A protein has these predicted regions:
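Active-site proximal beta-strand in glycosyltransferases
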Residues: 35-43, 53-71, 90-92
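A short helix->loop->beta-strand "cap" motif at the edges of active sites that frequently abuts
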Residues: 55-60, 87-88, 106-108, 184
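Short beta-strand segments
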Residues: 5-7, 40-43, 113, 145, ...
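Donor nucleotide-sugar binding/catalytic pocket of nucleotide-sugar-dependent glycosyltransferases
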Residues: 88-100, 106-125, 137, 147
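Conserved alpha-helical elements of sugar-nucleotide-dependent glycosyltransferases
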Residues: 10-21, 93, 160-171
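N-terminal pre-catalytic "stem/leader" segment of glycosyltransferase-like enzymes
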Residues: 1-52
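Conserved catalytic-core segment of nucleotide-activated headgroup transferases in glycan assembly
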Residues: 124, 128-191
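Membrane-proximal helix-turn-helix segments that form the acceptor-binding/catalytic region
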Residues: 71-90, 104
Length: 191
């Protein structure tokens, strides 16, 4: 069995997923869809980059990461329906996404969370105190962290409002006020 995994080439998490998949399962991976038994549309929104003849003649798995209901009308819904005619199975990372796409397809939907790369996401050897010291952050300071990418992808300027940057800011304001009443400084670390 040979698998071609479609990367969006957007310098985003899906590109890393494809790279990690290909690195860990290289014996199953091919670099061109014509050589594959299965085409994995890990970046499902890029499906039309694959020639239709391959989509018709291969097994196709599409990963749907999430649907934004407010955006899933018109073009996005038409695009989903056009792609659905080629998809044999959907992969989604959570039940919420499964519930969102179920009304739009009769194809099987497999819920499987994304993996975590332990070489990237792990505890630092330094203690929290050592990290605070290295960053010049007082031990008593209350820290709030955010590492999500909140842009639309086609540029790094347009906010991705469904990720709730407004809600994050509201929560930060509330925490800052609460901590100030307690006499504690609060800071936000963005990555």
């Amino acid at each position: 069995m040979k698998i071609f995994t479609l990367a969006p080439k957007e310098n985003w998490i899906c590109d890393r997923f494809v790279h990690e998949w290909n690195s860990h399962y290289s014996e199953y991976c091919v670099s061109h869809p014509k050589d594959a038994d299965i085409i994995w549309l890990l970046a499902d929104w890029c499906w039309n980059q694959i020639p239709v003849e391959y989509l018709k003649n291969k097994k196709v798995v599409a990963s749907v990461h999430h649907i934004v209901p407010e955006k899933f009308a018109g073009k996005e819904e038409l695009d989903f329906k056009a792609r659905d005619q080629f998809v044999d199975l959907y992969h989604v990372p959570c039940e919420k996404t499964r519930d969102q796409i179920t009304p739009h397809t009769s194809k099987p939907i497999w819920v499987l969370p994304f993996w975590v790369n332990g070489s990237l996401w792990h505890r630092k050897k330094e203690s929290v105190g050592e990290l605070r010291s290295a960053l010049g952050i007082d031990e008593k300071c209350f820290l709030i962290g955010s590492f999500q990418r909140d842009t639309e992808g086609h540029d790094l300027k347009s906010p991705k409002l469904e990720k709730g940057p407004d809600l994050f800011c509201d929560a930060v304001e509330k925490i800052f006020k609460e901590k100030k009443k307690e006499g504690i400084e609060a800071r936000v670390l963005l990555a």
